[in-house]
């Protein structure tokens, strides 16, 4: 496997002028093959750092690149963009390898050389931030190389590929470059259109023509599994670390959807989870007719897709040693819709919590009542509310409702808003009727953000907005405040 040094910062116009580069150069930047001499890159960096103010010793090694895809498909290259981000990327399509090199000594030398050039340009030309090329993303040393992969790739795409892309025929199609589609999983044209096609990308004063081969779709599918795209900022999150980050976007902090199993793992102590009614499944009580797909077949397909039997998981577990009854809805299963089985499982959970004198947690994530079950799904609202009435008023026990995105419809109108303490996640979409339904029914525009957790909190709709990383500790403190203690602590007090 060959190793290449890729320096896209040479596209800075001022640097081209200093080094006598040709602005019409049709490549992404200087590339040198370090396959022959592994120490060559260190030597070049040293000579670059000690250059005088009007010359650049590395210009002798420049040559053009006609097809960047050749390097992406089976080679390794080191990248430093004009924003100051430096990183080494290894691609191996055949073996599905995509990783970042962990060479901190090389990073420090490489960055210092780029930053010294930037400071030199500031002094000589009087730049003070008005040049858009110098709005750099500084490397944050608190992240390891692997955790920094997302911001590096995103910075590279923004600065090199996604700035201004157009098809040679003249039609505008921004952000549709080969690398962007390969990482984001965008749609690829069919093979007959791909063969021999080309695209010109303008990157800050220079033109790059990228040839697309007929197997773009194959490459796209191979790398699609590596990333999760944020639905708020559209930033890319490396899937390998996404679960450890609790499905929170590293770019903007947005809380993305989370499966019920992941939420149980987040809240319940390991080895203490005891599920309830796992074998309870939905039938077709009203023989719902659908031209697209029968209701039973749809249930079966979601069961295979999610590994769940229904849109809620219920059970008993321990939260920091405190026994709790918990139900977690899963939006991935038919939009978390509430049918007869969901209502029955939650009702049984409440009754068991009342009998065993346990605090109750219900994590809501639902689109509302399930239309395929008609009035049977609507009656679950009254059934669950009746069970909660006995639990809260007669048994005097403690119920915490956690509203996640989205929580709408019948769940919002029933047990979602009946908690003694109502907690919402940041940025959660919480409503009775959705924005589209309201606008179509009333023919009025719903203000942006009027159904977001932050706005509703100001109106007093719930008690707390708690980020995921603090949720378990906040719940633990609430339970202790209401005289629910860990098992070992409770037994020691009795003695």
Swiss-Prot record:
This is Acetyl-coenzyme A carboxylase carboxyl transferase subunit beta, chloroplastic. Pathway: Lipid metabolism; malonyl-CoA biosynthesis; malonyl-CoA from acetyl-CoA: step 1/1. Keywords: ATP-binding, Chloroplast, Fatty acid biosynthesis, Fatty acid metabolism, Lipid biosynthesis, Lipid metabolism, Metal-binding, Nucleotide-binding, Plastid, Transferase, Zinc, Zinc-finger. The lineage of its organism: Eukaryota, Viridiplantae, Streptophyta, Embryophyta, Tracheophyta. It catalyses: N(6)-carboxybiotinyl-L-lysyl-[protein] + acetyl-CoA = N(6)-biotinyl-L-lysyl-[protein] + malonyl-CoA. It holds the Pfam family Carboxyl_trans. Binds 1 zinc ion per subunit. One of its GO terms (molecular function) is zinc ion binding. It is found in: Plastid, Chloroplast stroma. Residues 188-208 are annotated as: Disordered. It comes from the Eukaryota. SUPFAM superfamilies: ClpP/crotonase. It comes from Nicotiana tomentosiformis. Residues 226-495 form the CoA carboxyltransferase N-terminal domain. InterPro entries: AcCoA_carboxyl_beta, Acetyl_CoA_COase_Trfase_b_su, ClpP/crotonase-like_dom_sf, COA_CT_N.
């Amino acid at each position: 496997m060959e190793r290449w040094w890729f320096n896209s910062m040479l596209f800075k116009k001022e640097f081209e002028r200093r080094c006598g580069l040709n602005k019409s150069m049709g490549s992404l930047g200087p590339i040198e093959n370090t396959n022959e001499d592994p120490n060559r890159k260190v030597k070049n960096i040293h000579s670059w750092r000690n250059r005088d103010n009007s010359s650049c010793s590395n210009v002798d090694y420049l040559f053009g690149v006609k097809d960047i895809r050749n390097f992406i498909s089976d080679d390794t290259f080191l990248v430093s963009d004009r924003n100051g981000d430096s990183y080494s990327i290894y691609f191996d399509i055949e073996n599905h390898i995509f990783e970042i090199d962990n060479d901190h000594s090389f990073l420090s030398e490489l960055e210092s050389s780029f930053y010294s050039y930037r400071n030199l340009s500031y002094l000589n030309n009087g730049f003070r931030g008005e040049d858009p090329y110098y709005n750099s993303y500084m490397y944050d040393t608190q992240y390891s190389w692997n955790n920094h992969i997302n911001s590096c790739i995103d910075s590279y795409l923004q600065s090199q590929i996604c700035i201004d892309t157009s098809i040679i025929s003249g039609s505008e199609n921004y952000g549709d470059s080969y690398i962007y589609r390969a990482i984001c999983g965008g749609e690829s044209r069919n093979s007959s259109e791909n063969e021999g096609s080309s695209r010109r990308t303008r990157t800050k004063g220079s033109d790059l023509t990228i040839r697309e081969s007929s197997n773009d779709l194959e490459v796209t599918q191979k790398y699609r599994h590596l990333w999760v795209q944020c639905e708020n900022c559209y930033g890319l999150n490396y899937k390998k670390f996404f679960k450890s980050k609790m499905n929170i976007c590293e770019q903007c902090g947005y809380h993305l959807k989370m499966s019920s199993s992941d939420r149980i793992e987040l809240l319940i102590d390991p080895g203490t989870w005891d599920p309830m009614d796992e074998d309870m499944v939905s039938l077709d009580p009203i023989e719902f007719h659908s031209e697209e797909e029968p209701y039973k077949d749809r249930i079966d397909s979601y069961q295979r897709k999610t590994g769940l039997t229904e849109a809620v998981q219920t059970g008993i577990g321990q939260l920091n040693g405190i026994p709790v009854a918990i139900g977690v809805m899963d939006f991935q299963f038919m939009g978390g819709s509430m049918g007869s089985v969901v209502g029955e499982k939650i009702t049984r959970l409440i009754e068991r919590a009342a009998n065993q004198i346990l605090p109750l947690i219900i994590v809501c994530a639902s689109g509302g009542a399930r239309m395929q079950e008609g009035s049977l799904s609507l009656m679950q609202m009254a059934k669950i509310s009746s069970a909660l009435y006995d639990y809260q008023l007669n048994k005097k026990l403690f119920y915490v409702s956690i509203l996640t995105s989205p929580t709408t419809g019948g769940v919002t109108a029933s047990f979602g808003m009946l908690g003694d303490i109502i907690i919402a996640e940041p940025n959660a979409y919480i409503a009775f009727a959705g924005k589209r339904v309201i606008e179509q029914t009333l023919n009025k525009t719903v203000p942006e953000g009027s159904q977001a957790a932050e706005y509703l909190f100001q109106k007093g709709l719930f008690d707390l907005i708690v980020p995921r990383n603090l949720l378990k500790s906040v719940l633990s403190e609430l339970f202790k405040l209401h005289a629910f203690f860990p098992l070992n602590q409770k037994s020691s007090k009795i003695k």
